[in-house]
């Protein structure tokens, strides 16, 4: 097993790369990369870690967007043939859950039990520090949006059977940390997901199931999509008022995703009707509507 690189070795490699870059023509990309080198060298020398969001806010004017930081960090790690963890870059934490889980730390550092109370979600801890997740739930439901998770949380008080389900939310496109949690428990629990019936909601499902470009190996292969589906909005034409017209970005995303056979029917349906449905619109009119759809969709989970 190869030895982990030392901080001084990483700093030395980055300084060498900086000198090479300085010999090239100046550009915004060059300035951005040099600023990131400077930050990572400082982190290595001080023995501190940061996540990509923290790095981004250290120099917003240079980095412009958080995705620039993410791409450059991945590029640097690839060039040096080391992991982001070796660079001192932690996972960005944004995923949350409602339920109770035990997190066993690496290197025998003990176990921490975390549970949500009063319907208040818990932040998923940094999974790079976790060796195992203790999960007693037979069913886990991934919810695309935290606004919908909040609605579900209010139903848990009324419907005690929902306490038997672990709810996880990646707040839109999931961070690596959220997917890592699900990957660690997918063989202990049936994992299902609730997503908008729109091209980008379906794309978010694909990120969970098939991985992203940056992390293709981090995926939840067993996750099933239980809603919102075409049949949910076709009932006696009762919900035709919830559709929003597709835009050019939606149409481009449909063309990208139709190659996934299991998703093509819903995608072609959206293109045919030139519309999409967000969960908030589908559930918002009556309190009973959320309860009705939620239990209907939960019945689709394979036990």
From Swiss-Prot:
<dbReference type="GO" id="GO:0030435">
    <property type="term" value="P:sporulation resulting in formation of a cellular spore"/>
</dbReference>
<dbReference type="GO" id="GO:0046872">
    <property type="term" value="F:metal ion binding"/>
</dbReference>
<dbReference type="GO" id="GO:0005524">
    <property type="term" value="F:ATP binding"/>
</dbReference>
<dbReference type="GO" id="GO:0003677">
    <property type="term" value="F:DNA binding"/>
</dbReference>
<dbReference type="InterPro" id="IPR034136">
    <property type="entry name" value="TOPRIM_Topo6A/Spo11"/>
</dbReference>
<keyword id="KW-0539">Nucleus</keyword>
<dbReference type="Pfam" id="PF21180">
    <property type="entry name" value="TOP6A-Spo11_Toprim"/>
</dbReference>
<keyword id="KW-0238">DNA-binding</keyword>
<dbReference type="Pfam" id="PF04406">
    <property type="entry name" value="TP6A_N"/>
</dbReference>
<dbReference type="GO" id="GO:0003918">
    <property type="term" value="F:DNA topoisomerase type II (double strand cut, ATP-hydrolyzing) activity"/>
</dbReference>
<feature type="binding site">
    <location>
        <position position="196"/>
    </location>
    <ligand>
        <name>Mg(2+)</name>
    </ligand>
</feature>
<dbReference type="InterPro" id="IPR036078">
    <property type="entry name" value="Spo11/TopoVI_A_sf"/>
</dbReference>
<keyword id="KW-0469">Meiosis</keyword>
<dbReference type="GO" id="GO:0007131">
    <property type="term" value="P:reciprocal meiotic recombination"/>
</dbReference>
<comment type="similarity">
    <text>Belongs to the TOP6A family.</text>
</comment>
<keyword id="KW-0479">Metal-binding</keyword>
<feature type="domain" description="Topo IIA-type catalytic">
    <location>
        <begin position="1"/>
        <end position="96"/>
    </location>
</feature>
<keyword id="KW-0749">Sporulation</keyword>
<feature type="active site" description="O-(5'-phospho-DNA)-tyrosine intermediate">
    <location>
        <position position="57"/>
    </location>
</feature>
<dbReference type="InterPro" id="IPR036388">
    <property type="entry name" value="WH-like_DNA-bd_sf"/>
</dbReference>
<feature type="binding site">
    <location>
        <position position="144"/>
    </location>
    <ligand>
        <name>Mg(2+)</name>
    </ligand>
</feature>
<protein>
    <recommendedName>
        <fullName>Probable meiosis-specific protein SPO11 homolog</fullName>
        <ecNumber>5.6.2.2</ecNumber>
    </recommendedName>
</protein>
<keyword id="KW-0413">Isomerase</keyword>
<dbReference type="GO" id="GO:0000706">
    <property type="term" value="P:meiotic DNA double-strand break processing"/>
</dbReference>
<dbReference type="InterPro" id="IPR013049">
    <property type="entry name" value="Spo11/TopoVI_A_N"/>
</dbReference>
<keyword id="KW-0460">Magnesium</keyword>
<dbReference type="GO" id="GO:0000228">
    <property type="term" value="C:nuclear chromosome"/>
</dbReference>
<dbReference type="GO" id="GO:0042138">
    <property type="term" value="P:meiotic DNA double-strand break formation"/>
</dbReference>
<dbReference type="InterPro" id="IPR002815">
    <property type="entry name" value="Spo11/TopoVI_A"/>
</dbReference>
<keyword id="KW-0799">Topoisomerase</keyword>
<comment type="function">
    <text>Required for meiotic recombination. Mediates DNA cleavage that forms the double-strand breaks (DSB) that initiate meiotic recombination.</text>
</comment>
């Amino acid at each position: 097993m190869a030895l982990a690189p030392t901080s001084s070795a990483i700093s030395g490699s980055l300084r060498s790369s900086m000198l090479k870059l300085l010999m090239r023509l100046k550009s915004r990309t060059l300035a951005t990369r040099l600023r990131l080198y400077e930050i990572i060298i400082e982190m290595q020398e001080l023995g501190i870690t940061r996540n990509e969001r923290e790095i981004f806010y250290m120099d917003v004017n240079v980095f412009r967007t958080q995705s620039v930081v993410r791409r450059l960090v991945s590029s640097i790690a690839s060039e040096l043939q080391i992991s982001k963890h070796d660079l001192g870059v932690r996972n960005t934490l944004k995923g949350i859950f409602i339920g109770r889980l035990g997190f066993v730390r690496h290197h025998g550092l003990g176990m921490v039990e975390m549970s949500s109370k009063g319907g208040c979600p818990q932040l998923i801890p940094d999974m790079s520090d976790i060796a195992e997740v203790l999960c007693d739930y037979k069913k886990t439901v991934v919810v695309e949006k935290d606004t919908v998770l909040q609605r579900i949380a209010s139903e848990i008080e009324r419907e005690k059977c929902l306490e038997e389900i672990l709810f996880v939310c990646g707040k839109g496109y999931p961070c690596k940390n959220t997917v890592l949690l699900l990957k660690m428990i997918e063989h202990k629990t049936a994992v299902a997901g609730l997503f908008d019936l729109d091209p980008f909601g379906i794309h978010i499902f694909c990120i969970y199931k098939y991985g992203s470009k940056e992390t293709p190996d981090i995926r939840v292969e067993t996750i099933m999509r239980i809603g919102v589906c075409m049949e949910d909005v076709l009932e006696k034409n009762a919900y035709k008022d919830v559709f929003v017209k597709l835009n050019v970005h939606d149409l481009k995303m449909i063309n990208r995703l139709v190659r996934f056979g299991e998703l093509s029917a819903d995608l072609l349906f959206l293109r045919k009707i030139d519309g999409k449905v967000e969960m908030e619109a589908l559930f918002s009119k009556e309190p009973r509507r959320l309860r009705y759809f939620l239990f209907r969709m939960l019945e689709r989970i394979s036990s």
